Amino acid sequence: MVKLVFARHGESEWNKANLFTGWADVDLSEKGTQQAIDAGKLIKEAGIEFDKAYTSVLKRAIKTTNLALEASDQLWVPVEKSWRLNERHYGGLTGKNKAEAAEQFGDEQVHIWRRSYDVLPPKMDRDDEYSAHKDRRYASLDDSVIPDAENLKVTLERALPFWEDKIAPALKDGKNVFVGAHGNSIRALVKHIKKLSDDEIMDVEIPNFPPLVFEFDEKLNVVSEYYLGK
């Protein structure tokens, strides 16, 4: 059976500060760095060997991927980066403290923005300091593709082509795959993999640690699902 390991990035500096992060390129905290290393140790203990690895273009996921691969003695494994694995874009909430946002907009509204499948948060202004429209890493993309806000539905729509073009074919080819990504991009792909309803995915949480493992048969039916070390 082939294995797919999802590793959400370790705790970031903005996770620690309780800020909405989205596409802001925030670094790992000291705790997050250790979580990434520990993820790699769990992978090594489980004897999982990878053939391919994928991550986003955000440093917290890139560093988590590299640290986990290094700790599992697999730093040589080819890593492909894609914006399609980025975190959900939190729009105008980016950089805001979650508790302060709840005070400003109300607990219920913020909960809907965070957990609903298809409700968009407020859009980010294109002149915002965190706008991806002026970020060089997205210069090759058509401007209309770069989001100003995303919900989980839109996140899945932009992540799904990468699943279909890269990850799924590798798994069907018998290759074990590592994906270092983000809470919501992983949630979106888990929804697709498990065929969850829009309501069911609302209750799914992806922790910073430990990694989540899926085992598939040759037709990519899920045979088992578990967290390493549990």
Curated annotation (Swiss-Prot):
Active site (catalytic residues): H9, E87
Binding site for substrate: 8-15, 21-22, 60, 87-90, 98, 114-115, 183-184
Biological process annotations from GO: gluconeogenesis; glycolytic process
Disulphide linkage map: none
Keywords for this protein: Gluconeogenesis, Glycolysis, Isomerase
EC top class named in words: isomerase
EC number: 5.4.2.11
Site positions for Transition state stabilizer: H182
Reactions catalysed according to its record: (2R)-2-phosphoglycerate = (2R)-3-phosphoglycerate
CDD domains linked: HP_PGM_like
Recorded GO MF terms: phosphoglycerate mutase activity
Keyword Isomerase: yes
Pathway(s) served: Carbohydrate degradation; glycolysis; pyruvate from D-glyceraldehyde 3-phosphate: step 3/5
Organism superkingdom: Bacteria
Pfam families cross-referenced by the UniProt entry: His_Phos_1
InterPro entries the record matches: His_Pase_superF_clade-1 (IPR013078), His_PPase_superfam (IPR029033), Phosphogly_mut1 (IPR005952)
Its job: Catalyzes the interconversion of 2-phosphoglycerate and 3-phosphoglycerate.
Similarity remark: Belongs to the phosphoglycerate mutase family. BPG-dependent PGAM subfamily.
NCBIfam families recorded: pgm_1, PRK14115.1, PRK14117.1
HAMAP family xref list: PGAM_GpmA
Name used for this protein in its record: 2,3-bisphosphoglycerate-dependent phosphoglycerate mutase
Native source organism of the sequence: Streptococcus thermophilus (strain ATCC BAA-250 / LMG 18311)
